[in-house]
């Protein structure tokens, strides 16, 4: 058995560094979303800002102490929130590419993305519940912030983002070019390159065995 004692100052510095890294990562993600998805990306950036504010307010309201595992849970939930927005925007682009109006594409895009988002988030929420019930103190901290983040991310992506998208359309941003173009799907011949993938897998296994040995 191994144990470590970490001083209060070192713990505070670690938490502060983690929060700064999370903030920088969030800003980078926002910039990427704006560049990649144009108007929907701007909407996603606002939604993520609202989401982050809601998470902080919820932690303060329930007096949840922020720890390193807790920060990890928040960062993971932010990633899931971004993933949900990406799914929605991809569906909207597909609808626009099929010739539908922007208004119809927005409504249909959210409807098509709903099941995938709910499935992924509910599965993770169940895992967080199990960790919270069966885990130790630090694991429970991770599970609690992850659960809070998932619930709030579902709310922001399915409600807040949708309201903002309709608001942007209502104020006059209705040209399809501002919502991006769907990328053409190029088929990849996995079966034809089976030998290459087997060779790569074997090389990785050998390297892993050598590293462990």
Where are the regions a protein language model picked out?
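A cross-kingdom feature of multi-pass membrane systems that activates on extracytoplasmic/periplasmic
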Residues: 1-8
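Interfacial segments of transmembrane alpha-helices in multi-pass membrane proteins
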Residues: 12-67, 133-137, 192
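Single-pass alpha-helical transmembrane signal-anchor segments
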Residues: 25-34, 196-212
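Small-residue-enriched core segments of transmembrane alpha-helices in multipass membrane transport
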Residues: 41-63, 74-81, 142-157, 205
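Transmembrane helix-loop junctions at the membrane interface of multipass transporters and ion channels
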Residues: 63-65, 127-144, 212
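Short helical (or helix-break) motifs at transmembrane helix termini and adjacent helical loops
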Residues: 77-97, 117, 154-159
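Helix-loop junctions and hydrophobic alpha-helical segments within the transmembrane domains
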Residues: 96-122
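Interfacial helix-loop-helix hairpins and adjacent transmembrane helices
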Residues: 155, 159-208
